[in-house]
């Protein structure tokens, strides 16, 4: 599986070739395929290439939903075969095994109470599932609200790797749209990489583009390559 997040770019040389080289079974996007301003054509163009490599599943990010023409953008994604998960899950089967891939919409609001309400409303729409369950969700900073909700793995983005990275250390700056969720502007708790809680793991993708006026420093763009193994193979 390949995870991408926070594309925020017109084009990225070598990106498609790198993803194709990994031969993923599926590709997932954890939000912000496009910026909230400008054309959404780069996001469509990217997905046209991705869908030729593997099935593509996506969830919304804040920049996606801030666009007045987001519905037009999603219609174009649907037309080329991208499945956007709006508070729903799909069952993926391979040989005799299956997993659930769930996705909920970005819960953007201006205060933490409304954000929590939006998350609860989204989770309530997901049908019950007793097997291995992966959640696609944009905002890594909200992991504490999700880590005890029964998901085995949460894939997230939004934090842009902390924008600046202290060498061998933490990310420094959180996106402005994280602040209403009681997340600190500086040195956010979750910014990139692998985090573990009892029964749940979260992988935070650093993102590809840069929507902020600040440059990325010690914080290279990334795609995340994830290999799931059956218990019998471990």
Per-region residue spans from a language model:
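Catalytic metal-binding/acid-base residues of hydrolase active sites
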Residues: 8, 34, 63-64, 89-90, ...
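Beta-strand-turn-beta hairpins that frame and shape the catalytic cleft
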Residues: 1-2, 90-103, 130, 196-202, ...
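Binuclear metal-dependent hydrolase catalytic cores centered on His/Asp/Glu-rich metal-binding motifs
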Residues: 75, 79-82, 94-136, 143-144, ...
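Conserved acidic residues
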Residues: 25-27, 54, 131-134, 152
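Conserved beta-sheet core of the metallophosphoesterase superfamily
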Residues: 139-224, 232-233
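Acidic/histidine-rich helix-loop elements
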Residues: 1-13, 33-41, 64-71, 109-114, ...
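Active-site-proximal beta-strand elements of phosphoester/diester hydrolases
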Residues: 1-8, 98-108, 134-138, 201-207
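Membrane-embedded segments
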Residues: 2-88
């Amino acid at each position: 599986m390949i995870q991408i997040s926070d594309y925020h770019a017109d084009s990225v040389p070598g990106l498609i070739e790198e993803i194709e080289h990994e031969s993923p079974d599926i590709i997932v996007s954890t939000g912000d395929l496009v910026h909230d301003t400008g054309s959404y054509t780069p996001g469509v163009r990217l997905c046209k290439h991705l869908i030729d490599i593997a099935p593509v599943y996506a969830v919304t990010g804040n920049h996606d939903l801030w666009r007045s023409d987001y519905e037009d953008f999603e219609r174009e994604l649907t037309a080329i075969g991208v499945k956007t998960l709006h508070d729903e899950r799909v069952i993926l089967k391979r040989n005799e095994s299956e997993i659930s891939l769930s996705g909920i919409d970005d819960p953007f609001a201006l205060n933490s109470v409304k954000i929590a309400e939006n998350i609860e409303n989204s989770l309530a729409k997901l049908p019950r599932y007793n097997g291995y369950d992966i959640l696609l969700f944009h905002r890594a900073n909200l992991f504490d609200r999700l880590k005890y909700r029964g998901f085995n793995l949460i894939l997230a983005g939004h934090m842009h790797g902390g924008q600046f990275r202290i060498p061998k250390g933490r990310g420094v700056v959180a996106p402005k749209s994280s602040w209403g969720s009681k997340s600190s502007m500086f040195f956010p708790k979750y910014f990139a990489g692998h985090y573990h809680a009892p029964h749940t793991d979260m992988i935070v993708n650093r993102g590809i583009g840069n929507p902020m006026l600040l440059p990325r420093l010690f914080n290279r763009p990334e795609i995340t390559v994830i290999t799931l193994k059956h218990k019998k193979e471990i």
